């Protein structure tokens, strides 16, 4: 079998729910223990909603069921109890072995919890009343009577298995299933009861037990119109078996809005729908088929899509299943009365051996995402190694296989049994067990999951169907008016707000038009995106209380609350670090402000007995913080349900991955505290663990409290009310009103139980060390370096931003003159408007106007200023030796990082801080060795190193430790099992369960964050938090490519996946164009050959078989098919490996003087080339926030002067702007015959920045290091110009033929006749000479192309960037019709063209002019929309270089394959043209 492309899977262990705490540990027998835990289940109902997976019911014993029916189940039960001697002897009733418990998995914390439920009082009374007058012949009443005879506290909800479960608006619904017969304790019967569990009240209620509805089990249930308020919401019940094990083919529909079955609705709208294909009924069962409900399809008619093995469908249809399968196993069934199912098309181009597997999957499961169906199953048997995952593209019928191997699969053999699609996070989840237990998929395990991202689905969207099959991509839901096309059910009564709603819908379409660049819907619904855009563009300034400072010195405002909510833990870390430092400085100076009520000593002394023992939750939010600490301002939410037992919540809240003194929380606390984190608050953005996910449209009234109250709680000071706009004190150390914040007395035992995730520690805990016993030993001018959270960073931001390099080694006292730096250079978080500079030293001369542009008002506020501190006069201590381990910021090499699990987008907060080593000043050891001051050592699991050096002398060049060298401590191990969440961008304000109020003092809260990126990129970064989507107007470069790196470094997995989705779309267009060109070229070659041989098929086939070029085209086409099917192409991979190996051997003499890559992603980089973001920021400041989150294994300390690859446009503030000035660039390469550019301010960002940034702008290093000077030397410039000139001469002489070939199609004979006899006679010898000349240059040419891949972190010379920017179209014009507007009249690129092509004979002026104008508008819309043209090769190379930085192996390989195929096709096209010319010569003399 071919080798699959790289897997993007990562596995995570799940913490199973513990037994409830009881006074008697022996109270639970074996049956009860199994019911209350999730070790094994058979026939439980499982569903995923939002960020939770719910499980209900099921047998608690593992049963291998080849087929699910009541007879087989009874047989397996008898065999099981016969084998189990102990169980067999003690067996009394089958109910003991069936669970009725409800569990849910919090995907963010990866922890299972049990929901403690009760029974609805009204329903219970109704049941008792009915039971008292029950008739003997009524089965349901018999069941109720039996229940009445039992325990009074027992819920009437019977234990069941093989039932269905779904979620809607904060409620769980279950239907049907098998229950134990009341007549016998071992017989199972089907039921038709429909139950509802309200997750707000945790009470069950019986909705229906209508005897007219068929009893069934082993079926599925779907929710229809969940997000449409204008239509009734319904439950669609599909498939299953009845009591006689006969299939139920009728689809039952329950109308939730009217609380009745569809046959009883008013007005009557019966719907008779049966599962069928072409009118022939089909039997669906959950164990052999799966079904999904697709509402947003092209026809605007909700339809079921179900999977059934192709041979089974053929049996129903009476076809011979031995024949080659031409239809996929996917059947679409519209939900209309008497509708007929249709088999979905399948791509016939796939070979039969690849179709056997997806057509014959066993135990299939799946879901849909965008216009793709993700399917998982087993073939040919149930062995765990035979689990396969496929993506079926609805548009093209394409099947593509996805690798599911994870980094841990070599150690543990996993068994997965269920596939989920986590749509809000664009991920697929595989649920199963870590170690293969050799059970069949009918045995359900819940201790392990694996995830892989879904943006890759866009790469499979090859448009093979006819035009009428094409589905237009839209981010908008189905227009309401389109629902009237089918008479499913009447629309609800029009309300008085319908006109306003209609106007708002029109406004939505105007403000947030449908995106054409993606087949996947946006994260947020349209109205949410509109609100976000309005907040950004209209109310951005009034709402903003925080700002991003860009590398160009611009300020971009954004609300701090929004960042905490949607950026999450990473931002919390930055904020807490800086806030802690400010508070510590305020305390150190011992100067009290009239605006700040802060008494750390008294509050500390009075808090010893107040703080209750608390444990950290796995997730949290600002909402939960308000709910617990400020209930007056809180929203009605889950916490109100928890307030009934606040002491339980505080005592039993537990970190999911942290051992504690009490191993298991009580059932009441676990259920009350964790059972409803997301779904109780139905119609607001409350999803703590899901910061940017779509919210279901609620059908109830709003449960918000007045929003102004919520604002007041977060924006008011403890003294003078709302003072967000008040600038901060500059000299006086400042802090928050932490009287309540400090009311915690953490014991060492308590600390030892805390997890070491950075984001789980609120600033209240961070401040503990700043008030330690040794606080009076600090010098007033000495920065706080023992903050418990940031031992490795020294100061909250100033030291944190020194992760990789420090500029103080060249000027140890430059902190005394902060004016030497520009505003943006000093605008890192906490030091824009705090009491110290970026180095952490106090400054009295700087005012707030530096960061806000407003006049200082400190005098007006009468804030007392302390006396200026003395300048330090002691000399800096000497630099430590290179081998000193304690000063190594990161412990692993780049190569180690590239192959580490921590490189994944799902990497949690902790993984990016494991294994770090810090530079801790000697003064720190004096007090951080004390028990209270060593909070960091206990929380972060780091041990202080002796002999560490002063903060002023950390060397810029750190040693390179051995690969995989890490710091192993009891609480910090370099493995993946300690991760806190699947995705790490979780807001974490609720990470400390306690009863003391924690309020940030607005005067002390940092308000600016320096980001070493261009303004356009940072603006887009901020826009994402407002809208939750990718803007189609963003430039591919620098914005989109920068955002990919930012999302990885700053840990925003959703943004990472959205950008990847766009990049995959661009790559898919390139591959599709290569496939079309290859097919067209082969058909043209065959047609011309057939014509030359007068239609003789035999001679034609013989000639083509012996023609090397045609055979190469065949191989290239096969390669494209293999890659598109999800497999490696062995030949292509072998060629690339050889090329990379030869390049590696020659790398010592390469132009850029760096070690080169070997293989896909095997990077080793020289220490001389460090991109700015790694080095810590532009302008050699090395203190930027860009270096904060880069993975800990990247120990790439470099030379003293940094490269500027990550901040290419710095307004005359670095050497880079002198080397690359946009105006200079235009002047040198401005088209002579075209329209010149205007250098106004508007074009400076949009058009002007393009030439600087399009291809390598972020990563094309223009190094000022002496070791890199060779790459921009005059010698290389001259050599490159000579090579380029030779290449252009060859290209120019053949330009007419090449351009004509681009317009050629297989029916076009006129183009072939254009090659005259003279041209033919001169062409071959001349081409021969040209080819000889090319061979002379081929070595250097190949070397150039190799160097474009063999680089350290994407660094190319300036010459190469200029050359490619100017001449890329000439290199690619034989295969890339990027500027051929005449052939694509619908292309959006035409709108930006300033010239039109008037002559086809000479295309050079046209292409030159078009290139600059077209490139300058390379927005995502123009690159990835449905009408976009294929990108040129250099765009793919740029994506590849960016992908190397983020270590996305799969995309890396696809880009390399695509570029290699494009290069091969370009060469083959020229050779094929030569062969066609020869054929003309053969056919001419023939009679």
From Swiss-Prot:
One of its GO terms (biological process) is negative regulation of ascospore formation. One of its GO terms (molecular function) is peroxidase activity. It is found in: Cytoplasm. The keyword Cytoplasm applies. Residues 658-677, 824-847, 1138-1150, 1263-1273 have a biased composition (Low complexity). Keywords: Cytoplasm, Kelch repeat, Meiosis, Phosphoprotein, Repeat, Sporulation. The modification Phosphothreonine is found at residues 785, 930. Present with 396 molecules/cell in log phase SD medium. This is Negative regulator of sporulation MDS3. The gene is MDS3.
């Amino acid at each position: 079998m071919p080798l699959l492309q790289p897997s993007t899977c990562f596995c995570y262990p799940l913490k199973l729910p513990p037994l409830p705490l009881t006074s008697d540990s022996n109270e639970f027998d074996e049956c009860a223990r199994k019911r209350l835990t999730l070790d094994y289940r058979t026939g439980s109902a499982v569903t995923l909603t939002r960020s939770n997976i719910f499980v209900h019911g099921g047998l608690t014993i593992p049963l291998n069921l080849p087929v699910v029916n009541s007879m087989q189940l009874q047989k397996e039960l008898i065999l099981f109890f016969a084998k189990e001697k102990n169980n067999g002897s003690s067996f009394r009733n089958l109910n003991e072995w069936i669970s009725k418990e409800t569990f849910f998995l919090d995907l963010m914390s990866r922890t299972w919890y049990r929901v403690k439920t009760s029974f609805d009082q009204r329903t219970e009374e109704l049941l008792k009343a009915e039971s008292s007058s029950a008739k003997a012949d009524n089965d349901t009443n018999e069941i109720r009577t039996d229940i009445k005879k039992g325990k009074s506290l027992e819920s009437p909800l019977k234990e069941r298995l093989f039932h269905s479960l779904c979620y809607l608006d904060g409620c769980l619904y279950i239907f049907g299933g098998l229950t134990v017969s009341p007549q016998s304790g071992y017989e199972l019967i089907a039921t038709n009861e429909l139950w509802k569990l309200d997750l707000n009240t945790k009470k069950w209620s019986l909705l229906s037990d209508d005897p007219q509805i068929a009893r069934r089990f082993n079926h599925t249930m779907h929710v229809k119109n969940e997000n449409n308020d204008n239509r009734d919401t319904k439950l669609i019940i599909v498939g299953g078996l009845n009591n006689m094990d006969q299939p139920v083919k009728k689809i039952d529909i329950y109308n939730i809005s009217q609380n009745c079955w569809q046959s009883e609705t008013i007005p009557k709208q019966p719907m008779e729908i049966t599962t069928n294909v072409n009118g022939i009924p089909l039997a669906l069962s959950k164990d052999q088929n799966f079904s999904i409900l697709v509402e947003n399809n092209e026809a605007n008619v909700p339809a079921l899509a179900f999977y059934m093995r192709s041979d089974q469908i053929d049996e129903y249809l009476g076809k011979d299943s031995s024949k080659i399968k031409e239809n996929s196993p996917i059947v679409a069934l519209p939900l209309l009365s008497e509708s007929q199912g249709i088999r979905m098309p399948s791509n016939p181009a796939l070979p039969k051996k690849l179709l056997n597997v997806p057509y014959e999957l066993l135990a299939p499961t799946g879901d849909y995402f965008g216009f793709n169906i993700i399917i998982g199953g087993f073939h040919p048997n149930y062995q765990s190694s035979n689990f396969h995952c496929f993506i079926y593209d609805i548009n093209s019928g394409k099947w593509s296989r996805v690798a599911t191997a994870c980094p841990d699969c070599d150690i543990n053999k996993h068994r997965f049994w269920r596939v989920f699609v986590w749509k809000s996070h664009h991920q697929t989840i595989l649920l199963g067990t870590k170690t293969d237990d050799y059970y069949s998929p009918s045995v359900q395990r819940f201790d392990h999951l694996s995830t892989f991202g879904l943006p890759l689905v866009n790469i499979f969207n090859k448009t093979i169907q006819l035009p009428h099959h094409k589905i237009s991509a839209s981010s908008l839901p189905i227009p309401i008016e389109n629902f009237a096309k089918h008479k499913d059910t009447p629309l609800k009564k029009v309300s008085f707000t319908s006109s306003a709603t209609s106007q708002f819908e029109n406004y939505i379409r105007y403000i947030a038009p449908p995106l054409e660049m993606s087949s996947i819907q946006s994260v947020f619904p349209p109205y949410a995106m509109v609100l976000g855009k309005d907040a950004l563009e209209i109310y951005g300034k009034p709402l903003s209380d925080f700002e991003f400072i860009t590398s160009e010195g611009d300020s971009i405002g954004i609300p701090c609350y929004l960042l905490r909510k949607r950026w999450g833990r990473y931002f919390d870390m930055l904020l807490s670090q800086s806030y802690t430092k400010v508070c510590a400085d305020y305390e150190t100076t011992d100067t009290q402000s009239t605006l700040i009520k802060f008494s750390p000593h008294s509050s500390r002394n009075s808090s010893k007995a107040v703080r209750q023992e608390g444990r950290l939750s796995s997730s949290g939010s600002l909402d939960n913080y308000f709910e617990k600490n400020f209930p007056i301002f809180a929203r009605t939410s889950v916490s109100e349900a928890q307030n009934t037992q606040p002491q339980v919540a505080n005592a039993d809240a537990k970190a999911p991955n942290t051992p504690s003194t009490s191993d298991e929380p009580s059932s009441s606390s676990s259920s009350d505290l964790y059972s409803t984190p997301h779904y109780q608050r139905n119609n607001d953005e409350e999803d703590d663990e899901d910061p940017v996910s779509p919210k279901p449209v609620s059908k109830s009234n709003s449960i918000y409290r007045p929003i102004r109250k919520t604002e007041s709680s977060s924006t008011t000071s403890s003294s003078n009310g709302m003072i967000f706009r008040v600038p901060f004190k500059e000299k006086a150390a400042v802090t928050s009103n932490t009287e309540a914040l400090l009311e915690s007395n953490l014991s060492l035992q308590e600390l030892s139980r805390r997890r070491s995730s950075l984001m789980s520690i609120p600033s209240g805990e961070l401040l503990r060390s700043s008030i330690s016993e040794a606080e009076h030993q600090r010098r007033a001018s000495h920065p706080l370096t023992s903050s418990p959270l940031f031992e490795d960073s020294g100061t909250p931001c100033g030291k944190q931003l020194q992760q990789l390099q420090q500029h103080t080694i060249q000027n140890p006292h430059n902190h005394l003159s902060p004016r030497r730096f520009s505003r943006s250079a000093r605008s890192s978080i906490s030091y824009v408007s705090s009491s110290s500079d970026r180095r952490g030293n106090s400054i009295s001369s700087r005012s707030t106007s530096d960061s806000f542009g407003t006049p200082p008002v400190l005098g007006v506020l009468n804030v007392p200023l302390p006396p200026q501190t003395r300048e330090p006069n002691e000399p800096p201590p000497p630099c430590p030796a290179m081998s000193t381990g304690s000063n190594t910021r990161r412990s692993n090499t780049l190569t180690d990082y590239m192959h580490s699990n921590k490189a994944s987008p799902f990497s949690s907060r902790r993984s990016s801080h494991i294994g770090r080593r810090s530079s801790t000043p000697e003064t720190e050891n004096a007090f951080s060795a004390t028990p209270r001051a060593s909070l960091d050592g206990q929380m972060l699991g780091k041990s202080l190193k002796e002999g560490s050096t002063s903060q002023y002398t950390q060397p810029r060049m750190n040693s390179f430790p051995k690969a995989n060298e890490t710091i192993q401590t009891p609480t910090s191990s370099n493995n993946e099992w300690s991760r806190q969440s699947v995705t790490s961008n979780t807001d974490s304000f609720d990470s400390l369960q306690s009863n003391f109020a924690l309020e940030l003092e607005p005067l002390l809260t940092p308000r600016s964050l320096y980001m070493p990126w261009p303004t356009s990129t940072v603006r887009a970064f901020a826009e994402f938090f407002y809208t939750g989507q990718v803007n189609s107007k963003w430039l591919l470069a620098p914005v989109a490519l920068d955002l990919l790196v930012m999302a990885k470094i700053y840990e925003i997995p959703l943004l990472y996946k959205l950008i990847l989705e766009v990049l995959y779309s661009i790559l898919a267009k390139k591959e599709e164009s290569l496939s079309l060109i290859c097919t067209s070229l082969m058909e043209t070659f065959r047609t011309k050959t057939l014509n030359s041989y007068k239609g003789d098929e035999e001679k034609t086939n013989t000639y083509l078989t012996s023609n090397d070029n045609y055979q190469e085209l065949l191989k290239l086409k096969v390669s494209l098919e293999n890659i598109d099917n999800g497999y490696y192409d062995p030949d292509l991979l072998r060629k690339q490996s050889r090329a990379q190996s030869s390049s590696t051997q020659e790398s010592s003499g390469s132009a850029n003087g760096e070690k080169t890559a070997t293989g896909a992603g095997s990077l080793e980089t020289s220490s001389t080339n460090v991109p700015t973001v790694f080095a810590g920021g532009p302008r050699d400041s090395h203190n930027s926030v860009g270096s904060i989150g880069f993975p800990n294994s990247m120990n790439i300390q470099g030379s003293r002067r940094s490269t500027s690859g990550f901040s290419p446009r710095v307004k005359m503030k670095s050497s880079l702007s002198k080397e690359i000035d946009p105006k200079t660039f235009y002047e040198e390469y401005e088209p002579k015959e075209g329209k010149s550019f205007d250098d106004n301010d508007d074009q400076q960002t949009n058009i002007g920045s393009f030439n600087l940034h399009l291809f390598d702008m972020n990563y094309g290093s223009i190094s000022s290091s002496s070791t890199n000077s060779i790459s921009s030397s005059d010698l290389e410039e001259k050599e490159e110009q000579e090579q380029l000139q030779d290449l252009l001469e060859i290209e120019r002489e053949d330009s007419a033929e090449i351009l004509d070939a681009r317009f050629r199609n297989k029916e076009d004979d006129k183009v072939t006749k254009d090659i005259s006899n003279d041209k033919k006679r001169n062409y071959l010898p001349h081409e021969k000479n040209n080819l000889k000349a090319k061979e002379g240059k081929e070595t250097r040419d190949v070397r150039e192309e190799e160097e474009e891949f063999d680089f350290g972190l994407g660094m190319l010379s300036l010459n190469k960037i200029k050359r490619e920017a100017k001449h890329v179209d000439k290199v690619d014009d034989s295969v890339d019709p990027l500027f051929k507007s005449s052939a694509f009249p619908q292309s959006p690129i035409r709108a930006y063209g300033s010239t039109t092509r008037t002559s086809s004979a000479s295309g050079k002026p046209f292409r030159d002019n078009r290139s600059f104008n077209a490139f300058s508008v390379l927005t995502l819309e123009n690159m990835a929309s449905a009408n976009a043209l294929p990108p040129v090769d250099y765009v793919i190379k740029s994506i590849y270089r960016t992908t190397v930085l983020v270590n996305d192996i799969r995309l890396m390989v696809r880009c390399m394959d695509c570029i290699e195929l494009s290069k091969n096709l370009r060469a083959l096209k020229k050779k094929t043209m030569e062969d066609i010319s020869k054929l003309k010569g053969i056919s001419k003399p023939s009679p």
